[in-house]
């Protein structure tokens, strides 16, 4: 899925705002994921999944760092996330559908934080970008 120059610009522009609150948005996105899709909790049996827990915030930070790497390497998301894709496919064995669910939760969290900036065009660009991220993370399953 190729992003246009305008879509890339929209993703990068919003990311500059998201980056300042990335850890909080990451934790919020995971909280949304676990409350909306409780079956996803099975991948974190060793985590304290209560709201605001250190482990939840830590993993949210890792998730958003990966999104930041994808933004930074928007022309080579595949290369930027290759090791993460292998980790989730071969070692953690996360069901690929969960990446789509998490990306949706990230989209909701970003939209909720920046409603005036999250125009329909920005929404479409971020949706396409996160779909690309999700697609890259599931490539190794094939």
Swiss-Prot record:
Annotated keywords:
Heme, Iron, Metal-binding, Oxygen transport, Transport
What's a Pfam family in this record? Globin
Give start and end of each Globin domain.
2-142
The entry's heme b-binding residues are 59, 88
Question: What does this gene product do?
Answer: The pi' chain is the counterpart of the alpha chain in the major early embryonic hemoglobin P.
One of its GO biological process terms is: hydrogen peroxide catabolic process
Organism field:
Cairina moschata
What is an example of a GO molecular function annotated in this UniProt entry? Answer: oxygen carrier activity
What family does the entry list?
Belongs to the globin family.
Tell me the SUPFAM superfamilies matching this sequence.
Globin-like
User: May I have one GO cellular component term?
Assistant: hemoglobin complex
Protein name as catalogued = Hemoglobin subunit pi
């Amino acid at each position: 899925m190729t992003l246009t120059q305008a879509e890339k610009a929209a993703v990068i522009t919003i990311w500059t705002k998201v980056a300042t609150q990335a850890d909080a948005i990451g934790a919020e996105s995971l909280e949304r994921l676990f409350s909306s899709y409780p079956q996803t909790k099975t991948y974190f049996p060793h985590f304290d999944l209560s709201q605001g827990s250190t482990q939840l915030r830590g993993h949210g930070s890792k998730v958003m760092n990966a999104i930041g790497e994808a933004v930074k390497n928007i022309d080579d998301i595949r290369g930027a996330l290759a090791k993460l894709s292998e980790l989730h496919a071969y070692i953690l064995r996360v069901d690929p559908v969960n990446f789509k669910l998490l990306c949706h939760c990230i989209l909701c969290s970003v939209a909720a934080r920046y409603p005036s900036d999250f125009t329909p065009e920005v929404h479409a660009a971020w949706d396409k970008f996160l779909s690309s991220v999700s697609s890259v993370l599931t490539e190794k399953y094939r």
